[in-house]
């Protein structure tokens, strides 16, 4: 299976490492690919020429660029009732799709919306019904471009107080006729609600990409500190996940995302040693 590393653990949230350095690092670790992040590693105003250079360099190093992520949507939502902000999020997504096409990326991570951002009180609280309707409308706006440029829109299950269960996700995704719209499934983000293998079993071919990470429960649920700094420690049953992935003939990316919130308030990224250890542990999974 294709195994990759998300940029943030290696390069941080402000783009401290270049795409070329990240490619070199992944190649040295024996990975199949990397996941660039737009807004830090990859600037939103990057040119087609620079994207082609990066893609060519990755090809020489035999490093895939199958997925791409962003943290943009936490501050600018596709589901906000604020029309100006929503338009800004839609326009960002169009640029994001174009960058993916230039780089040869097949799948981008999109956060469909949020009823509340629990760690940011400055963000508005929006009703579940409105998030459903506005996010659907926004995704419909960008889907034609995604189809034209052959880029998948993978909506991630995050702590956005929206779409908690596998069946909610199925109902939501079934609204979209396009095969370009699916889920970017995070194995750890769902653990306070349901087992990850249950989502995969129900969503099947709608699973377009996977974030590999872990979560440790506390007090019958858990908070941000449940996201530790050891990929192999936590609630995720990787053997069960692999079994269900094989049952649906999953061929997408398996990308380790390591943001060790358990270290708060002393979390520091980038952490190259943690990135290296995470790569080695990822390689022991999904054999």
Task: Name the predicted role of every residue range.
Residues 35, 67, 109, 154, ...:
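Conserved beta-strand positions in the central sheet of alpha/beta enzyme cores
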């Amino acid at each position: 299976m294709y195994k990759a590393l998300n940029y943030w653990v290696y390069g941080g949230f402000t783009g401290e490492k270049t795409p070329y350095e990240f490619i070199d690092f992944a190649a040295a670790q024996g990975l199949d690919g990397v996941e660039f992040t737009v807004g830090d590693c990859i600037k939103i105003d990057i040119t087609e020429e620079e994207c082609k250079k990066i893609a060519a360099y990755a090809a020489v190093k035999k490093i895939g660029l199958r997925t791409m992520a962003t943290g943009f949507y936490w501050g600018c939502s596709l589901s906000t009732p604020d029309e100006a902000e929503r338009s800004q999020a839609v326009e960002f997504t169009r640029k994001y799709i174009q960058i993916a096409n230039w780089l040869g990326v097949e799948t981008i991570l999109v956060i469909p919306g949020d009823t509340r951002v629990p760690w940011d009180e400055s963000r508005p609280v929006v009703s579940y019904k409105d998030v459903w309707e506005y996010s659907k409308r926004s995704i419909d706006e960008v889907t034609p471009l995604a189809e034209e440029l052959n880029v998948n829109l993978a909506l991630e299950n995050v702590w956005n107080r929206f779409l908690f269960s596998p069946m909610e996700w199925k109902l939501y995704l079934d609204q979209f006729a396009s095969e370009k719209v699916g889920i970017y499934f995070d194995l750890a983000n769902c653990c306070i609600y349901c087992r990850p293998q249950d989502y995969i079993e129900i969503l099947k071919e709608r699973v377009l990409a996977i974030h590999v990470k872990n979560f440790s429960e506390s007090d019958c649920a858990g908070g941000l500190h449940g996201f530790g700094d050891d990929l192999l420690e936590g609630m995720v049953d990787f053997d069960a996940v692999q079994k269900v992935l094989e049952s649906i003939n999953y061929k997408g990316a398996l990308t380790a995302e390591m943001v060790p919130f358990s270290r708060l308030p002393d979390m520091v990224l980038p952490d190259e040693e943690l990135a290296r250890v995470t790569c080695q542990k990822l390689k022991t999974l999904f054999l």
